């Protein structure tokens, strides 16, 4: 069903560790408007879509969201992979580190774990499409917020911007 290419949709090469940015960007991995929920939303809704063309489109979009999930997790990993304890202490990443060290785990920036209640699949085409449109706007707002936070680091800004626009 899928053809996985062993490369990211957009190259990511973050040179500088930044635990604070990692703690914010993780929200697009497992936060309320993140890519994990987005992929699950589309891939779940496709089964009850009465129009095969739209079901196929939901599959395509859900698959693309999985690609975004991979990009976000790569950003978090690259921002944290060489952290020292001195860099971690006193940052928002410190509490995350206690439970996950530098593993990538789905949660919001505020520490709330991912929960399937964050997305919906009602089995009604109009309701589900309305859910999708609202979810895309919430994700856009979150990416806008992240772009304001990472403006000073082009290695982070560029892949966040790419993911925001696709």
Where are these regions (language model features)?
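Long, low-complexity intrinsically disordered regions enriched in Ser/Thr, Asp/Glu, Pro/Gly
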Residues: 2-3
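Conserved oxyanion/phosphate-binding beta-strand-loop segments in alpha/beta enzyme cores
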Residues: 7
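Acidic/His metal-coordination segments adjacent to aromatic residues that form catalytic metal sites
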Residues: 13-30, 93-132
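Alpha-helical bundle segments that constitute or directly flank the non-heme di-iron/ferroxidase center
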Residues: 17-51, 67-71, 126-150
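A cross-kingdom feature marking solvent-exposed beta-strand/loop segments within repeated
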Residues: 53-56
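Conserved alpha-helical segments that form or flank metal/cofactor-binding pockets of metalloenzymes
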Residues: 60-106
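Short conserved catalytic/interaction loops centered on acidic-Pro-aromatic/His motifs
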Residues: 152-159
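Conserved small/polar residues in nucleotide/adenosyl-binding loops
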Residues: 163-166
């Amino acid at each position: 069903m899928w053809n996985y290419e062993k490369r990211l949709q957009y190259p990511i090469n973050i040179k500088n560790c930044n635990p604070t940015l990692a703690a914010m960007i993780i929200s697009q991995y497992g936060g309320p408007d993140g890519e994990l929920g987005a992929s699950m939303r589309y891939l779940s809704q496709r089964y009850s879509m009465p129009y095969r063309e739209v079901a196929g489109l939901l599959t395509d979009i859900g698959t693309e969201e999985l690609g975004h999930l991979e990009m976000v997790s790569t950003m978090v990993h690259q921002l944290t992979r060489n952290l020292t304890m001195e860099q971690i202490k006193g940052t928002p990443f410190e509490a995350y580190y206690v439970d996950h060290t530098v593993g990538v785990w789905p949660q919001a920036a505020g520490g709330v774990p991912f929960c399937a209640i964050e997305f919906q699949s009602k089995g009604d085409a109009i309701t589900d499409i309305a859910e999708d449109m609202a979810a895309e706007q919430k994700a856009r707002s979150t990416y806008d917020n992240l772009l304001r936070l990472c403006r000073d680091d082009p290695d982070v800004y560029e892949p966040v911007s790419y993911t925001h626009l696709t």
